[in-house]
């Protein structure tokens, strides 16, 4: 279904349903806080400058402007998530099923690529990242997964004191408004609408039944007591529309006179006086401008842009900066290091019944799906179709799940940039705590040049063995009786791939990013030479500068990254405002009865 509206005209008209919803937004009154520019010679100050209106930046813009004494400037390199020149929502972003349209389009997307990967047969991988209001929450598959409680306890052990599960859970709950209501794990009053998968599609039902037949439990809530098992996914979809952080946090704050939100604005460097951050320099409409702060500059550009901007500003490995002629403000060798991502592989089967999303690519069917969504926000356009999934342990002795599954009643080829070839279904499966760690470095001093990105995929034997398990365990699930009415031939990797050597070769040839880069501005103790920010999210070695986004994770979590990134921003906002930390939430968390078996 990801291919449904790739060929639709950008001049599509919006009927009453879409217009009525879009009209709920209110225009922002003019802000008196004029941005200082090189041309004017002015020096207007803001309390905070937030760089990046993405998953974290939108949260911060909202929470910081709750205090009317805070004047906040929010700078986004990309455009608004609205139709050009109007207040109407851009359907390409807000229609859940149209997500591939943005993965294929650099208008809202940084369109990064990695360096050639030796562990993946020398392939260069495509890394889409959001460049629009909402950031990657406006491009992603809308899957809301927090990870496992032990991910956050591990952060605490790695030096991010106060970021254990008991101290993070309250901020997951603060952000969330779950359609099923609040409990000890879920939030019920937050701005982020979260819904639960509810499709009756026979292939989703077969997937859940097959997992049970293979001996895995059903879990009622992957974000609650028990992550381990298979069940219905939570999604950031509300009333048939994508619910990004732009919808949840930014739009409600735009009417505040103490918030100025600029788009099409590329920040080129942080301005320093000595080691104190005093503002930023940015490019807009081809002109250089400067804006200044009385308190702090906050980088929320994500795991690629935030370390890139730090290095462009003179904060990073001094030897690397000197080679490019960048004056060193602070030698901080951890900047851009510790890069972690989730890798995944698609296991695909032909379907013997015409019930997959293949038919949705037919021109007339596309029109019908699009019109139903535009009119009512219902139908196949109102979901990304990744409504079931699961988490399991790869082998005995693993304490909590390290493999994740997303099921899709369709076939994905080249990130959805190529149409499906036939009736088919697939599982996205991958490991969640790889031991391979990468890096990113500046390619040049030009802020418009993408940095060198080296995830170092499959560089350890452990990671190769874990992916071998991913393939074998997925095949076992697909072989269960529940899929018998639908099971055609295995399309990928194909029945001819059987030996460990053949499976390894398949993984190296076909594995791809799950789009979860993180950890490049690691949070830790100031005494840790690899740390970039402290437990308060302050950049070590300088003043008045923070990083708040997925880059500060000490290690990648066991699941998708959007929910944890929003949590990080909520928690950091309280730190900045000096609010008392929300109370400990010591809730029960499932543990396997034995680690002697894999399930």
Curated annotation (Swiss-Prot):
Matches recorded under InterPro entries: FAD/NAD-bd_sf, GMC_OxRdtase, GMC_OxRdtase_N, GMC_OxRtase_C
Protein source organism: Rattus norvegicus
PANTHER family (UniProt xref): CHOLINE DEHYDROGENASE, MITOCHONDRIAL, GLUCOSE-METHANOL-CHOLINE GMC OXIDOREDUCTASE
Modified residues annotated as N6-acetyllysine in this record: 489, 501
Active site, per annotation: 516
Family: Belongs to the GMC oxidoreductase family.
Reaction catalysis annotation: choline + A = betaine aldehyde + AH2
Pfam families tied to this protein: GMC_oxred_C, GMC_oxred_N
Keywords per UniProt: Acetylation, FAD, Flavoprotein, Membrane, Mitochondrion, Mitochondrion inner membrane, Oxidoreductase, Transit peptide
GO process annotations (BP): glycine betaine biosynthetic process from choline
Protein name in the entry: Choline dehydrogenase, mitochondrial
EC numbers, comma separated: 1.1.99.1
Modified residues (N6-succinyllysine): 441, 489, 501
GO cellular component, one term: mitochondrial inner membrane
Localization of this protein: Mitochondrion inner membrane
Catalytic EC class: oxidoreductase
Tissue: Expressed in liver.
């Amino acid at each position: 279904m990801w291919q449904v509206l790739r060929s639709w005209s950008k001049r599509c008209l919006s009927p009453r349903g879409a217009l009525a919803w879009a009209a709920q937004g209110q225009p922002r009154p003019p802000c008196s806080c004029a941005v200082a520019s090189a041309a004017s010679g002015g020096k207007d100050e803001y309390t905070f400058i937030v760089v990046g209106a993405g998953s974290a930046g939108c949260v911060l813009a909202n929470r910081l402007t709750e205090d009317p004494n805070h004047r906040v400037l929010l700078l986004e390199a990309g455009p608004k998530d609205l139709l050009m020149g109007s207040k109407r929502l851009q359907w390409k972003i807000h229609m859940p099923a149209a997500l591939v349209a943005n993965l294929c389009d650099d208008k809202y997307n940084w369109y990064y690529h990695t360096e050639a990967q030796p562990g993946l047969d020398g392939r260069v991988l495509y890394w889409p990242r959001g460049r629009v209001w909402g950031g990657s929450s406006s491009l992603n598959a809308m899957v809301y997964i927090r990870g496992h409680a032990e991910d956050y306890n591990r952060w605490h052990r790695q030096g991010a004191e106060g970021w254990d599960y008991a101290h993070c859970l309250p901020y997951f709950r603060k952000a969330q408004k779950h359609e099923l209501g609040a409990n000890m794990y879920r939030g019920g009053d937050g701005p982020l609408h979260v819904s639960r998968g509810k499709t009756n599609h026979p292939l989703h039902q077969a997937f859940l039944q097959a997992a049970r037949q293979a001996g895995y439990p059903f879990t009622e809530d992957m974000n609650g007591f028990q992550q381990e098992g298979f069940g219905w996914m939570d999604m950031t979809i509300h009333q048939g529309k994508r619910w990004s952080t732009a919808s949840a946090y930014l739009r409600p704050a735009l009417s505040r006179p103490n918030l100025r939100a600029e788009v099409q604005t590329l920040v080129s460097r942080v301005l320093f006086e000595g080691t104190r951050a005093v503002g930023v320099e940015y490019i807009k409409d081809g002109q250089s401008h400067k804006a200044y702060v009385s308190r702090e500059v906050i980088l929320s550009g994500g795991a690629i842009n935030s370390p890139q901007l730090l290095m462009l500003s003179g904060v990073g490995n001094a030897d690397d900066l000197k080679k490019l002629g960048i004056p060193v403000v602070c030698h901080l060798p951890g900047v851009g290091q510790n890069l972690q991502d989730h890798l995944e592989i698609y296991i695909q089967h032909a379907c013997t019944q015409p019930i997959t999303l293949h038919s949705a690519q037919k021109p007339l069917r596309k029109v019908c799906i699009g019109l139903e969504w535009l009119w009512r926000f219902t139908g196949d356009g109102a979901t990304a179709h990744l409504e079931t999934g699961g988490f399991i342990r790869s082998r005995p002795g693993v304490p909590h799940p390290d493999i994740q599954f997303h099921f899709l009643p369709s076939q994905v080829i080249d990130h959805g940039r190529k149409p499906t070839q036939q009736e088919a279904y697939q599982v996205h499966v991958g490991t969640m705590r790889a031991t391979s760690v990468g890096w990113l470095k500046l390619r040049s001093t030009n802020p418009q040049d993408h940095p060198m990105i080296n995830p170092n995929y499959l560089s350890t034997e452990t990671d190769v063995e874990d992916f071998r398990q991913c393939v074998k365990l997925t095949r076992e699930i697909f072989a269960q009786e529940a899929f018998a009415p639908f099971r055609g031939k295995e399309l990928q990797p194909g029945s001819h791939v059987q030996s460990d050597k053949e499976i390894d070769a398949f993984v190296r040839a076909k594995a791809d990013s799950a789009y979860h880069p993180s950890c490049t501005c690691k949070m830790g103790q100031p005494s840790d030479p690899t740390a970039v920010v402290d437990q308060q999210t302050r950049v070590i070695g300088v003043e008045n500068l923070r990083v708040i986004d997925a880059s500060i994770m000490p290690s990648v979590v066991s699941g998708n990254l959007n929910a944890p990134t929003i949590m990080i921003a909520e928690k950091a906002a309280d730190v900045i405002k000096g609010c008392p930390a929300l109370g400990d939430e010591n809730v029960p968390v499932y543990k396997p009865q034995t680690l002697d078996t894999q399930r």
